Each structure stands twice: as C-alpha cells, then as structure tokens.
C-alpha cells in the first residue's frame, strides 16, 4: 500500500476532509484534529502499517501536517 494514500485515508476518516491538497497544513492549528483524534490516528496508523508509536513518545510538532505524518510512518516502517 502507498504510505501517502494510506495516511490520507486515515486522516479523511478522522477529519471528514480530503487533505490531499493540504499536505503542509497544520491539522491541529486549523482545528481538524485534537488530542483525542491524535490517539485515534496513532492507533489507526499502527494497525494499518504495522508500526509501533507509543502515545508517550508522540510529539505533536512532529506529526502536525499530512506530509510530516507520511514521513514519520515511512521512517518507522524502515526501522
């Protein structure tokens, strides 16, 4: 599965928005995601991509745009 599309699918499910043309938009500052949605996103990413992202190690600034999320998932897949 394409990582970018998989991440966008999860974000679409959580936000109800197509973010494919907003890859560098801060999804927290624009109100699309909150802390509860972050936990749901992490759980979905872990399940879909078979990666481990402990909530305790989640730094929102590293996961605040779709592009950053894709990059983090790709780096975790390669560990």
Swiss-Prot record:
Gene Ontology terms describing biological process: cell wall organization; lipoteichoic acid biosynthetic process
GO MF: D-alanyl carrier activity
Post-translational events: 4'-phosphopantetheine is transferred from CoA to a specific serine of apo-DCP.
InterPro entries: ACP-like_sf, DltC, PP-bd_ACP
Keyword match NAD: no
Major location category of this protein: cytoplasm
Pathway terms, separated by semicolons: Cell wall biogenesis; lipoteichoic acid biosynthesis
Residues carrying O-(pantetheine 4'-phosphoryl)serine: 35
Key words of the record: Cell wall biogenesis/degradation, Cytoplasm, Phosphopantetheine, Phosphoprotein
PROSITE patterns found in the cross-reference section: CARRIER
Signal peptide: none
UniProt KW Transcription keyword: no
A Gene Ontology term for the protein's cellular component: cytoplasm
Compartments (UniProt record): Cytoplasm
Residue ranges annotated for the Carrier domain, each copy included: 1-77
Function noted in UniProt: Carrier protein involved in the D-alanylation of lipoteichoic acid (LTA). The loading of thioester-linked D-alanine onto DltC is catalyzed by D-alanine--D-alanyl carrier protein ligase DltA. The DltC-carried D-alanyl group is further transferred to cell membrane phosphatidylglycerol (PG) by forming an ester bond, probably catalyzed by DltD. D-alanylation of LTA plays an important role in modulating the properties of the cell wall in Gram-positive bacteria, influencing the net charge of the cell wall.
Family label: Belongs to the DltC family.
Protein name according to UniProt: D-alanyl carrier protein
Organism: Lactobacillus acidophilus (strain ATCC 700396 / NCK56 / N2 / NCFM)
């Amino acid at each position: 599965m394409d990582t970018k599309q998989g991440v966008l699918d999860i974000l679409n499910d959580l936000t109800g928005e197509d973010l494919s043309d907003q890859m560098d938009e801060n999804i927290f500052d624009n109100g699309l995601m909150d802390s509860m949605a972050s936990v749901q996103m992490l759980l979905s990413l872990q399940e879909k991509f078979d990666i481990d992202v402990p909530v305790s190690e989640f730094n929102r600034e590293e996961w605040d745009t779709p592009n950053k999320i894709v990059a983090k998932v790709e780096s975790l897949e390669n560990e």
